[in-house]
């Protein structure tokens, strides 16, 4: 047997034990012992599980690394080309060729953003399918292990000897199962194998086996997760970090650590570019003498209700908070409501709960509004205790990134409004239909926050609510809006001083390039999270994926070396 089975997978060398026959007729075979060490096998299976996870992770992350590192097909050269076309426009603001060049580079850039998101989304869907395939193979293996436990017990009872062939099959199955997932093996009295998940939930217990299922995540219908079906037939979703070893663990870990993060970073980059550019474009005037509109469109945030919510309340609207896009982060969020009806908002990337000052919740008796991290959600009622929601602000934003302009005359290269003064403000923006009255406005802010507006009687809002300059005062952080022009006051004047701001419709002509220059300057502005330029953010993402790829390869080489 030892010679004929030398290449048989799972075969263990056998040792024949001889003894004197009872009839003094020479020797007889007393036993055939299988040479198998459970401790060595356990260590080998653990190493196999770890190596399999790393190999799977390395195979997946290398695809993203190759995508991002391609200097010709990457986003960096296309963003550079887009801003270079703005430089050409600034040099000849009324030239049709310069305007057509800008639209062409914008279309090419947005198409590449969509292609990147599509590639990453295909990987998400591919992982969903691979998880389902792995679960099928795992269930087949655990069912066979339970069957072998029964057959081995029966064989021992019949002959009183170890059925070596069946034992080899069982240990080979455990080794193959270890390639797919990390597991816990316990040998009970009677030599039966019990297999359980790392969290202790049984998969094989004697002659019984329990099934895993690839199920739709209860918090995200686009995501496949592991479900555990107990003896009562109840299906419960497992935490995504339950399995960390084997092919299955490699897929789950890669998705959580790298794929989700990269897709969110691409989305954050797209939203930051679109929001910043649209804001500046609305401050411009086109060749028809009209205010500029949104140059780009972008996908809005996604929000999902947990399937076990009991309050019957859904998120009816999810949108970006244009005044607070510097708070936008490349992460998903989990919202959970407490007994008092207040939300608790947690970042999914690091598990940090947002402080009370980082979100705002308001329920008016009919509709709830929650703002945090650069997004605003509208609820159609008051969620009850335990209700949960999954929010993906930027995950699929790039999938719907498009250029809105096809008419060359609609490019707002000239300046729509003029502004000057020493008032400390930021986020100056023109909403649709701004300055329709044609008035020029003069504002004066005192150290105590009192605001004088000329002409008097002009409608003013503060943080979205009516503001009366006669009785109300301004504090740092307030957002004011007058005739469609909005801005945030960042600081009050020093003691004994006042600050002023004047704005109105600018005089513009076909040769005006002031807004084209302002849009070009966005290339170096800190548009991403208020801390990084577009090129810096993209370079950081490429570097992060590259570093992760190298770490995985080094660890894999160490395991296989």
Annotate each PLM feature:
Residues 1-561:
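S/T-rich, low-complexity, solvent-exposed segments of bacterial secretion/appendage proteins
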């Amino acid at each position: 047997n030892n010679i004929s089975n030398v290449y048989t997978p799972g075969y263990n060398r056998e040792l024949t034990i001889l003894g004197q026959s009872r009839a003094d007729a020479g020797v007889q075979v007393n036993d055939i012992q299988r040479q198998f060490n459970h401790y060595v096998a356990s260590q080998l299976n653990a190493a196999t599980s770890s190596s399999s996870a790393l190999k799977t992770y390395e195979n997946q992350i290398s695809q993203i690394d190759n995508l991002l590192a391609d200097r010709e097909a990457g986003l960096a050269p296309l963003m550079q080309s887009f801003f270079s076309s703005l430089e050409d426009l600034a040099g000849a603001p009324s030239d049709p060729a310069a305007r057509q060049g800008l639209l062409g580079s914008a279309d090419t850039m947005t198409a590449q953003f969509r292609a990147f998101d599509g590639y990453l989304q295909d990987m998400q869907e591919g992982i969903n399918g691979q998880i389902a395939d792995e679960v099928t193979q795992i269930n087949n293996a655990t069912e066979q292990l339970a069957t072998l436990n029964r057959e081995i017990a029966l064989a021992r009872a019949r002959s009183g000897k170890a059925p070596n062939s069946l034992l080899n099959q069982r240990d080979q199955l455990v080794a193959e199962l270890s390639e797919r997932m990390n597991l816990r093996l316990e040998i009970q009295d009677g030599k039966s194998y019990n297999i359980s998940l790392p969290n202790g939930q049984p998969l094989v217990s004697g002659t019984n086996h329990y099934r895993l299922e690839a199920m739709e995540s209860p918090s995200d219908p686009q995501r496949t997760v592991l479900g555990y079906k107990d003896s009562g037939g109840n299906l419960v979703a497992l935490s995504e970090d339950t399995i960390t070893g084997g092919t299955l663990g490699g897929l789950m870990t890669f998705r959580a650590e790298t794929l989700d993060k990269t897709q969110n970073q691409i989305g954050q980059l797209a939203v930051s570019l679109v929001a910043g550019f649209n804001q500046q474009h609305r401050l411009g005037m086109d060749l028809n003498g009209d205010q500029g509109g949104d140059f780009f469109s972008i996908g809005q945030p996604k929000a999902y209700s947990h399937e076990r919510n009991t309050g019957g309340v859904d998120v009816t609207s999810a949108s970006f908070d244009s005044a607070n896009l510097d708070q936008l982060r490349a992460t998903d969020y989990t919202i959970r409501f407490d007994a008092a009806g207040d939300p608790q908002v947690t970042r999914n990337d690091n598990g940090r709960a947002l402080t009370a000052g980082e979100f705002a919740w308001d329920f008016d008796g009919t509709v709830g509004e929650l703002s945090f991290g650069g997004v605003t959600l509208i609820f159609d009622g008051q969620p009850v205790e335990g209700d949960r929601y999954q929010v993906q602000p930027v995950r699929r934003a790039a999938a719907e990134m498009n250029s809105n302009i096809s008419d060359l005359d609609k490019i707002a290269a000239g300046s729509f409004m003029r502004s000057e003064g020493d008032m400390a403000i930021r986020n100056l923006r023109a909403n649709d239909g701004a300055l329709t009255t044609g008035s020029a406005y003069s504002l004066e802010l005192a150290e105590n926050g009192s605001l004088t507006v000329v002409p008097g009687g002009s409608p003013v809002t503060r943080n979205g609510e009516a503001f009366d300059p006669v009785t109300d005062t301004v504090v740092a952080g307030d957002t004011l809006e007058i005739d469609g022009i909005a801005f945030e006051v960042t600081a009050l004047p020093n003691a004994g001083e006042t600050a002023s701001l004047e704005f109105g419709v600018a005089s513009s002509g076909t040769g005006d390039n002031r807004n084209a220059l302002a849009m070009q300057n966005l290339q170096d502005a800190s548009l991403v999270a208020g801390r990084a330029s577009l090129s810096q953010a993209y370079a950081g993402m490429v570097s992060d994926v590259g570093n992760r790829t190298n770490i995985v390869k080094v660890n894999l080489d160490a395991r296989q070396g």
